[in-house]
């Protein structure tokens, strides 16, 4: 990130970053998915850091991705898939609890709207 920092110890580097208003936070991510038009890049057990530099947040992902064609159902707990509009049980429960409706009604509305927030808003 900073050129010529080979001689700095990590503590000194952190102190300098704090002086410049840069906060660095480790995120305990289990999986990171990057979706492009053609494929999904799935990082299992990736190292993720959040850098906040004066309000601008940047995420850094380090790891080996597995490439999947878009639309493969490799991950069971995706919040939604593009073709089927399938949602995880957690998503259905969240909508049902927030809107005060049954899970079947929540699932139908999720499939209809394709979005958690829109489903809750429609049901309220």
From Swiss-Prot:
InterPro entries: NAC_A/B_dom_sf (IPR038187), NAC_arc (IPR005231), Nas_poly-pep-assoc_cplx_dom (IPR002715). One of its GO terms (molecular function) is RNA binding. One of its GO terms (biological process) is protein transport. Residues 53-124 are annotated as: Disordered. Residues 7-74 form the NAC-A/B domain. Keywords: Protein transport, RNA-binding, Transport. It comes from the Archaea. SMART domains: NAC. Homodimer. Interacts with the ribosome. Binds ribosomal RNA. Belongs to the NAC-alpha family. Contacts the emerging nascent chain on the ribosome. This is Nascent polypeptide-associated complex protein. It comes from Natronomonas pharaonis (strain ATCC 35678 / DSM 2160 / CIP 103997 / JCM 8858 / NBRC 14720 / NCIMB 2260 / Gabara) (Halobacterium pharaonis). The gene is nac.
């Amino acid at each position: 990130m900073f050129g010529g920092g080979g001689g700095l110890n990590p503590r000194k580097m952190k102190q300098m970053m704090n002086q410049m208003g840069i906060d660095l936070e480790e995120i305990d991510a289990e999986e990171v998915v990057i979706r492009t038009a053609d494929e999904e890049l799935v990082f299992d057990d990736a190292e993720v850091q959040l850098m906040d530099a004066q309000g601008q947040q940047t995420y850094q992902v380090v790891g080996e991705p597995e490439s999947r064609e878009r639309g493969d159902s490799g991950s069971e707990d995706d919040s939604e898939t593009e073709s089927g509009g399938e949602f995880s049980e957690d998503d259905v429960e969240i909508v049902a609890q927030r809107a005060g409706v049954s899970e079947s009604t929540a699932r139908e509305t999720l499939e209809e709207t394709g979005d958690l927030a829109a489903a809750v808003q429609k049901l309220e």
